[in-house]
Each structure stands twice: as C-alpha cells, then as structure tokens.
Amino acid sequence: MTMHQDHGVMKDLVKHPNEFPYLLQLAATTYGSPAAPIPKEPDRAFCYNTLHTVSKGFPRFVMRLPQELQDPICIFYLLLRALDTVEDDMNLKSETKISLLRVFHEHCSDRNWSMKSDYGIYADLMERFPLVVSVLEKLPPATQQTFRENVKYMGNGMADFIDKQILTVDEYDLYCHYVAGSCGIAVTKVIVQFNLATPEADSYDFSNSLGLLLQKANIITDYNEDINEEPRPRMFWPQEIWGKYAEKLADFNEPENIDTAVKCLNHMVTDAMRHIEPSLKGMVYFTDKTVFRALALLLVTAFGHLSTLYNNPNVFKEKVRQRKGRIARLVMSSRNVPGLFRTCLKLANNFESRCKQETANDPTVAMTIKRLQSIQATCRDGLAKYDTPSGLKSFCAAPTPTK
C-alpha cells in the first residue's frame, strides 16, 4: 500500500470507525499466515510473478483457493489476460487482432509461440508466453481441455466485436458473456472436476450471471478511462441505454450534462443488478469453504460496488472505488451461506432506502426497486432454509443443498 493509499484509508476510518475491526479481521485472514513462496520451477515462478505484476487484487483471490486450484486458476487468468491484451492493444490493426484472436487457442498448445508487445506491463507475458503453456500442459487433461475450449470460444467472441459498436442490451449481454460469463462457466466446471462443489454448481445460469455481474460493474467503472482512450475511445455501454439520455456517449463528459449522465448511470447499474439474484442462488452448491468464500468475495464486492456507483457523478470524472473498510466488512460478513444472504439482504435494504430518498424521480427507479426487492426475497428464502440451529450458523462450508 502506498503512502497515498494509506492516507486515504485513514481518512475513511475517521469517517467510518465501525469498519476498523473488519479491516483487522480481513488483514488477519489475508496476511496472518506466511505468504506462499514463489515456486522454484522456472515456469511456475514466471507465472506467479507475472500474476502479481499484471493484477493487484487477483493474486489474493488465487491464494484464497484450495492449493489444488491455485495453479489452474493462475494459468487460466494468464491465458485470458494474454487474450485480453490482444483485444485491448490499440496499436494493432483490426484485421490483425481479429485473425490473432480467432487462432489464439492454437498458441495455447505451442511452446514456441510468442509475441512482441509494447503494451505496458503485459509485454513480458506475451514475449514469454511459452512458460505459461509449459505449466498449462502439467494440469489434468480435462482441465487443459476446458481452458483451451474456453480460449477458443472467447477469442472468437472478442473477434466478432472488434469493429462492432454495441447497440442493444442483448449485444451487451453477449459481449459480456464472451469475455466474462464464459470464463465463469469454465472456472465452475473445473471446480466441479476437482470435487469442490456439487454437480448442480455447473450451471450456465449461475456461472454466466456472476461473470456478467463482474464485467458490467467494471464497464460502468471504466467510463472515464475508456472514453479518453488513445488513439480512440472503445466503449461498451449499449446505445439502447445511453441513447435515451444523449446524442453521443461522450456528451456525458460535459459538466452541463451531468444530470442526464447520472440518470443513464443509474440505468446501467439497474441493468447490471439483474445478475445478482441468479448469482446468489448458485452459491449454495459450493461445498468447499475456501472456494465458497473466494466466490462470495467476488459477489458481495460487486454488489457493494454497484451501490457505490449508483447515482455517483464522480463516475464521469474518475475511477470510483469502494472504501477498503467497507470491502472488509462485506467480505468478513459473508464467510458462510447465512452470512452471505444476510450481507446481501442488508445491502439491498440500504440500496432501496437510498433509491426512495435520493432518486425518487429517476426514470428507472421503479425497476431498480423491483430488482432490489427480488434480491431481498431470495435472501429471506435463503435464510429461512439455511440459517438453522443445525450448524449452518458456524463458520462452516457452504452446505450441500437438499432437493
């Protein structure tokens, strides 16, 4: 943590002192044990060092997983990060990108392929890609097949959208499915392969929904960064939504348009919220407590992040983030099934109160409240089923669901 970040956390704690115990608890669970050493094998060492280089938060997520899942998820992340680097590199011509994306899965079986790249911190990943392939080939054959099939599917989906403006919400859903939902499906399949969840977890509805929830939260967050991308913007907000509020998406950059910009933002958040309920319902199938807690972290922080983005004009000026203390509170309150339902119920209740106080005249507030009430009902049903004296209140694994 930099001095600037440390100062920001301290300022937040002065305003929200009740979050301090949760920060301590999270620090104890995250940093209380010695950090996992970097592997001695050169290929695995490269992969874990690269993971720490290209991502701030994901290494902590990987380290929270059972040991047998850490290599597979680390490698899968790097495969997709390499694919994403091709998609995002604005120095590549469209035809070059499309061609490379459609055959990238073939390079995941080729220890001799690499690519020169000037794309910042990802250059080393692309230039030493054979080391990633080397570790991939040490994974169980079924896991390798799942990952290569997903890279092929995702790469072709990305290629379809390289020169395509996202016009409709259906196209927006499809793009997010290709780049995130399909990833969730592959990860869940591997978790089931390792017997860390019941077969019911391998559900398109759950895995795709959690992926779409995470991706849409990122797309909303990245408005200011993406609209100012050089040499040209690349935006993913669907025209079917933003076209109701402006003639051009860039109009939201203008201070005089901030009121309509925030209305559009609230519409985007409301759209993303429809993926929370199916994500919640699928969580009960993850019977390994470590896997459950890692996925619950993703779900509650995404829900909390949407509530931070909602009605927040700063989205159009900067990258809006949640307070670290708030994240700690959400994570530490969601370590088992009842805790997850209670946390999401509280988030939904607070969100609904804000809607009634802050955005009563917003054009999409009725739909926002309807979706929040549906989430509330799911949480209450979950608590009625799982928050019993039979031991589910303890810090146990997610229960094996009963039919």
Swiss-Prot record:
Gene3D superfamilies: Farnesyl Diphosphate Synthase. It comes from the Eukaryota. Its EC number is 2.5.1.103. It holds the Pfam family SQS_PSY. It is an enzyme of class 2 (transferase). The keyword Aminoacyl-tRNA synthetase does not apply. GO terms for molecular function: metal ion binding; squalene synthase [NAD(P)H] activity. One of its GO terms (cellular component) is endoplasmic reticulum membrane. Its cofactor is Mg(2+). Mg(2+) binds at D84, E87, D88. GO terms for biological process: farnesyl diphosphate metabolic process; lipid biosynthetic process. Belongs to the phytoene/squalene synthase family. NCBIfam families: squal_synth. Catalyzes the biosynthesis of presqualene diphosphate (PSPP). Works in combination with SSL-2 or SSL-3 to produce respectively squalene or botryococcene. In most other species, farnesyl diphosphate (FPP) is converted into squalene in a two-step reaction by a single enzyme. This is Presqualene diphosphate synthase. It comes from Botryococcus braunii (Green alga). The gene is SSL-1.
